[in-house]
Amino acid sequence: MVWKHQLIGFSGIFSNVSPASVKVTVGSQVWVEDPDEAWLDGEVVEANGQEIKVNCQTKTVVAKVNAVHPKDPEFPELGVDDMTKLAYLHEPGVLLNLKARYNANEIYTYTGNILIAVNPFKRLPHLYGNEIMEQYKGTDFGELSPHPFAVADSAYRKMINEGVSQAILVSGESGAGKTESTKMLMQYLAYMGGKAESEGRSVEQQVLESNPVLEAFGNAKTVRNNNSSRFGKFVEIQFNHMGRISGAAIRTYLLERSRVCQVSDPERNYHCFYMLCAAPEQETERYQLGKPSTFHYLNQSNCHALDAIDDSKEYLATRKAMDVVGISPEEQDAIFRVVAAILHLGNIEFAKSEESDGAEPKDDKSRFHLKVAAKLFMCDEKALENSLCNRVMVTRGESITKPLDPGSAALSRDALAKIVYSKLFDWLVTKINNSIGQDSSSKYIIGVLDIYGFESFKTNSFEQFCINLTNEKLQQHFNQHVFKMEQEEYTKEEIDWSYIEFIDNQDVLDLIEKKPGGIIALLDEACMFPRSTHDTLAEKLYQTFGSHKRFTKPKLARTDFTICHYAGDVTYQTELFLDKNKDYVVGEHQSLMNSSDCSFVSSLFPKSREESSKSSKFSSIGSQFKQQLQSLLETLNTTEPHYIRCVKPNNVLKPEIFENVNVLHQLRCGGVMEAIRISCAGYPTRKPFNEFLTRFRILAPEATERSFDEVDACKKLLARVDLKGFQIGKTKVFLRAGQMAELDAHRAEVLGHSARIIQRKVITYLSRKKYLLLQSASTEIQAFCRGHIARVQFKATRREAASVRIQKQARTYICQTAFKKLCASAISIQSGLRAMAARVEFQYRTKRKAAIIIQSQIRRCLCRRRYLRTKKAAITTQCGWRVKVAHRELRKLKMAAKETGALQDAKTKLEKEVEELTSCLELEKQMRMELEQVKTQEVEDLRSALNDMKLQLGETQVTKSEEILKLQSALQDMQLEFEELAKELEMTNDLAAENEQLKDLVSSLQRKIDESDSKYEETSKLSEERVKQEVPVIDQGVIIKLEAENQKLKALVSTLEKKIDSLDRKHDVTSSNISDQLKESASSDYEMLSNLAAENERLKALVSSLENENYENDGNDSPNEQKEGPQMLKEEILAEDFSIDDEMTNKLAAENKDLYDLVDLLERKIDETEKKYEEASKLCEERLKQVVDTEKKYEEASRLCEERLKQVVDTETKLIELKTSMQRLEEKVSDMEAEDKILRQQALRNSASRKMSPQKSLDLFVFMYLFQPVENGHHESFAPIPSRRFGAMSFRRSQIEQQPHEFVDVLLKCVSKNVGFSHGKPVAAFTIYKCLIHWKLFEAEKTSVFDRIVPIFGSAIENPEDDSNLAYWLTNTSTLLFLLQRSLKSHSTTGASPKKPPQPTSFFGRMTQGFRSPSSASLSGDVVQQVDARYPALLFKQQLTAYIETIYGIFQENVKRKLAPVLSSCIQGLKDSSHEFSAETLSAESSEQNSPEKPSEENPPEKLSEDNSSGKLSEDYLAAKPSEDNSPAKPSEENSQAKLSEVNPQAKPSAENSLAKPSEENSPTETWQDVIGLLNQLLGTLKKNYVPLFLAQKIFCQTFQDINVQLFNSLLQRECCTFIMGKKVNVWLNELESWCSQATEDFVGSSWDELKNTRQALVLLVTEQKSTITYDDLTTNLCPALSTQQLYRICTLCKIDDHEDQNVSPDVISNLKLLVTDEDEDSRSFLLDNNSSIPFAADEISNSMQEKDFTNVKPAVELADNPNFHFLKE
């Protein structure tokens, strides 16, 4: 025998036609391979060498000649019952035969002696029953239709006649019907075996009833089968010499233990559990059971019941079957008590014990189930708990009890449940065998093997490894048997034959079970070592079998391995191999069960014979299974096998469905195709002589003439066609592979030649006959036609004359009627047009009058507001001037005072003056309050005026005459408005003149400064030496630097003068623009008559916006979403210009005030060089108060014209550097003053020239407070200044205690590193805060600690690529700011809280508001003590706020930078896939060839600014501005989403609904998953660093804004604005929505709403019937958030010429086109812009912090043991 050691693939190896012998011509019927249907039949329509074109029913296929199989044209409709009778024995022939018989409900087919059974998934009563068994009784095999009864009968007859034991092997995959086939076999054998009695019960009845018992405890529902056997079973039925059943034995293999504790959805656990839960009520009460959903071992799956199966009836049937097989009622009760105990055992949950480190039952519910389980097991409850929660380790001389953690206790519980169930099942099998009884004197046996088929799943573990080993063994046995049958066939026919090569899988068996060195041997060896893991096992396997051709290692796996089985490659996961291979029982469980009071339970766990485990021999599941398998094969080798291969026709378990690919795979895995291949290797075609001659006698007719011998005739016939290699047997002709096809080709050639001769003769006869008939008929037809034509012509002539007359009269009547109708229509149209024109004119005049009234009221309000502001500024200037005059008088008095008493009197007078000034300030405050009241009253008046206007608008619709009168009065009001505007222009000119005067004043002051500087230089030279002697601590370098600062400030004054000049120029331009707009307003025409109705609505919106403007007083007009029409636009421009003029006037006034302050400052520098240090300090403090008030006014003005400040950003940035250097100089001077306090005081008392140097320090302090350092380049309102005298403040500063600088280094070294988090709170922020509070640094007037802490926060920006580091410092800085906000209060804060100012709109405004406002965190006083903060602390909080926004901006930019290329790749991938899809399915759609309308008719920029953000902003985070919040989503968005779901119902977040499934590795779906991956990575970074939820929501909102902008702008491109693209993007958006729901709203917030533009655009794109959409539906329901430009572009781009119903109606497009103005020509205003602004304020962070208790935060490890930082533990 020749053994062929090679692996043959599945494709094309079973063909009996070799490529060289295939003869294919045009017209041949062949089979071609197809990936979907396995094989398709068709006709060859073209043959080109080795390639042919085959026309199938559904498509045309081009294939190679050697890749096709011939088709039998004479194939019977119902197929053949034995596939060896097929003319062509190949894969397509086998599939066709099985399918034909399956459709005819003939589910059984022979392949030689092999029976193939196809599961019908329905009842077929005609195939079973006693009458059917009677038919097959004693019938020869193959005489009747194929049936399992025939196989059983053949086995029984051979056993009786030949005296040889038989075996029937039933195999197939789960759900193929193995169990049912086994039942029928046993039923027939019991029928044939008679009725021998054994103890009152028949043996055959016990054998049959053992099936339901074993099914109840060994079968379960799986995904593939509702009654899947989870164990292998071999039933040995013993017969005596009379052929009667004398005994039986059941052997089981490899029960699936893990199913007891772990069930996957939608599978079920073993049937017995559900039967017991459905038992009668008294049974369930006894076992304290309930519904299956209440038990952990059953509720892991949602499937608790099976269709058409009643578990309660099955329970009673099982109990009845137990009675039959000999299980007593007491034993049955014990069995089900154990089953119930297992269920209760699974409900025991464990938690960590409070008394020890071990585990204990979690709650009362767990203890209840523990108690019930102990009761059912009849064991001690405490002992059961200890066995589950403890382990006893036996050492030399003692035993150690080790407590288990909750997880290990749960594993111990599951281990006990599995071993108890396994022991119970083994007991049942043993009991059934003992009950049935085995006959030791039996002569023969018939074994029925019900074994699992070949299995290959996504995850393959130890069970699949053992199952596939079994199938490899059985396949080898099967191959050898089939080969033997083939040899017997050839020997019987007495033909010459050679040995046949067939596949041998011995190498796979050696790989698995060879000892030593096999996989099982290595697995057992690994199990013997306690430290072995699946990693070491896998490594050992790789080292041992790395070069084996049947063993491979997967590329991306570390512990998996792949074995090349006969049915395909299977990859096994080794994670649970070691645990599943170990066959041991936990000692505690063994002792507990053995000590049970129930004899049944204790019998399941008998005492071990060997007390010491060391002396016992190691045993494993793999070794035991191998031994059982070897014993099974030895038994099979002693018997004659019969094979039944069960096939599952489909995976949906439904009848009438036959899946070719699935069936073919099962035939290959079951070895059927291998048997066919072995047959094909010899003589696959075998025809009896009579059939062969009947089919091919036309090839040699002379061989069959008269009387002939069949053998000689066959030889002559084969010699005629020159066929070689055939064999002539006794009754059959044996042909080689391909010879049958060659004979068919010769036969078709002969038949074709004969058919052509017959066709030629018949065609000749028919053509001659037809010609003669046509000749005689044509003669008669011609005569008849000529007469008929003459008659017809006469009638036509008469008819023509009559018709001419009738037409003349008819045309006359039609023309008259049409003319009359036209006249009537013209009159009607003219009257309608005149009426419409009159109505339009009336409505226009009505609206114009209302607009004029509104404008007049607004202008009056604006003028009054300007007047009040001017009055307020004048009062402030007067107060400042009076203060300055009083200061001069005070200086004169001090210069006259020589003695100490005089000085004290002067001081007293000065204090009185200060009190007077204080009263003046109080008076000014009262005036401000009065102004506020006046302002409020004006607002109320304006509201009432607006209400009156609304009433007037309603009254305008009463009569036409009243409206005309109101229009005349409106014209008079317009003239008054023109006069007011002229006055306003005059006032503007006056302001310009005032600016000129201020410039002159500045110039004069500059000259004074120069003179004072020259005098100062001369004086300084004379007193330089004396100053050095008396005040040696003053450094000359400091003086030089201060002089340099003075020069820089001079340059600053000149810069501000230039700024004023530029503002004057802007004022002139504004004035000219106002005049031009007034002229344009007077000469505007009356267009857009069709939009008058819409203008009325827009006018109402304008009134609403004006009300909002008066309420907010911040100059920001609320967006008006429907401003259209030239006339309304001009009126809006006019109102806007008035607002601009107001803003310019306020700006000029504010600049004037600023110049006044600078002038006062310079004049004070000249005067204060002659005063003492303390006197100058007092005067400076008062001046600073005034400057603070003035700067606050300037801040209000700057908010109104914030956009104008962008022009001076560069200059202010340079100013920041100057301020920073000044601050550093001030700190140095302050330190020097503190160190040499005594020397400087003595110098001030004794030196006559002490007025020089101290003045420099004074200048430094003055300018430090005037220009505080800011972070973003904007002017900041002054920091709160202590209310005490400047001199007293200086004295207190000199007296402050020394800070603990020696501990600062330790603190900085600790917090500069990542010290992590404690209870989700940052340790670094908590440590810094506690140290600053403890050291009282917030109350210090001067300290450098804050300057040393700030650079630590700057380290987060040094590495902007490290997102984790940025998130860490973002959490620390925000938490520290929260702590500062709740703890610090401004030193100048009074008890009365002022009225809350409007929310600032700029980055600088938010910072200063957070700087000024007290902490907004609502915390009780006992949590933290309020601290009276000084300037350094407030400045530190300001810098901290700036760092938070800087770090946030960098982090957001990193996210955007990572997300942008991935989104671009996604969009590009969708474009490519959309083009491919469109080329195949949408070739008729050519909408993209039609260019859309020019963008010149899109909406104006004003509309775009209302719908989108306020434009692209600077990426400089320090100067960033907040964007306008997007308008909230309208309720109609929900309707849009609902409509989107209706249009695309399958668009759900699952992989099954994807529109395209590209085969490339870089598919768009994978790229979209990259976006989800980035979002998951971002979410993980935020969670890891405990970023506050408020900031996390802002980050995700801004990220989703960027996604919305990129996706929406892409959809507005021509290639992306398609139906297919919309569906694909919508699928991914559903996945993104699913991700948002999984990420929870706490982190993502309202991020999903940021995609509203893209979602609404997709609604329009994926709507199929776009022609039914109206304009109102489009703008109100479908896409309310999209602008007119965007809607117009989408409607034009998605237009398809050949599908009018899929296009938007032309009326809607024309309406959109009318609304698009000509101003946007060549613009791209339809695109969305990215918004890089900071979307939050400092107070919002503090308000959003949820955690307000930091008492449980642990300090850093480095500081915990330091005694100097013991306060951190308090």
Swiss-Prot record:
Residues 511-545, 547-570, 605-629, 629-651 are annotated as: Actin-binding. ATP binds at residues 172-179, 225-233. GO terms for biological process: actin filament organization; actin filament-based movement. Residues 900-1253 form a coiled coil. SUPFAM superfamilies: P-loop containing nucleoside triphosphate hydrolases. Residues 1388-1407, 1477-1566 are annotated as: Disordered. GO terms for cellular component: myosin complex. Residues 78-748 form the Myosin motor domain. The keyword Coiled coil applies. Keywords: Actin-binding, ATP-binding, Calmodulin-binding, Coiled coil, Motor protein, Myosin, Nucleotide-binding, Repeat. Residues 25-73 form the Myosin N-terminal SH3-like domain. The keyword Coiled coil applies. IQ domain mediates interaction with calmodulin. The tail domain is a globular cargo-binding domain. Belongs to the TRAFAC class myosin-kinesin ATPase superfamily. Myosin family. Plant myosin class XI subfamily. Homodimer. Myosin heavy chain that is required for the cell cycle-regulated transport of various organelles and proteins for their segregation. Functions by binding with its tail domain to receptor proteins on organelles and exerting force with its N-terminal motor domain against actin filaments, thereby transporting its cargo along polarized actin cables. This is Myosin-10.
